[in-house]
Amino acid sequence: MGERYNIHSQLEHLQSKYIGTGHADTTKFEWLTNQHRDSLASYMGHYDILNYFAIAENESKARVRFNLMERMLQPCGPPPEKLED
């Protein structure tokens, strides 16, 4: 019983510490946005992948990095409208 409580408290701690881990009220849009932003940040952080994208798009590395940062603003498009209850 004590171990179960410990696991839940660890999960709650991770969810409060890191944005992308989600929580019980995370919507599908928020989850996908976090996944896309995490992927884009990984692409920017790995030098070889950034070089590959630059060669494939025939752009400079700085331009590719700028485009990736621009895509991080709204990676899945505008958020869906909230339904009012």
UniProtKB/Swiss-Prot annotation:
Gene Ontology BP term (one): regulation of gene expression
The entry's keywords: mRNA processing, mRNA splicing, Nucleus, Spliceosome
Keyword Nucleus: yes
Keyword Transmembrane appears in the UniProt entry: no
GO CC, any one term: SAGA complex
UniProt note: phenotype after gene disruption: Lethal at the first instar larval stage. RNAi-mediated knockdown in germ cells results in male sterility.
Coiled coil: none
Localization, UniProt: Nucleus
Domain of life: Eukaryota
Cited InterPro entries: SF3b5/RDS3-10, Splicing_factor_3B_subunit_5
Summary of subunit composition and partner proteins: Component of the SF3B complex. SF3B complex associates with the splicing factor SF3A complex and a 12S RNA unit to form the U2 small nuclear ribonucleoproteins complex (U2 snRNP). Identified in the SAGA transcription regulatory histone acetylation (HAT) complex; the interaction is RNA-independent.
Function summary: Involved in pre-mRNA splicing as component of spliceosome. As part of the spliceosome complex, plays a role in the regulation of spermatogonial differentiation. When associated with the SAGA transcription regulatory histone acetylation (HAT) complex, might be involved in the transcriptional activation of a subset of SAGA-regulated genes.
Family: Belongs to the SF3B5 family.
Protein name: Splicing factor 3B subunit 5
Species name: Drosophila melanogaster (Fruit fly)
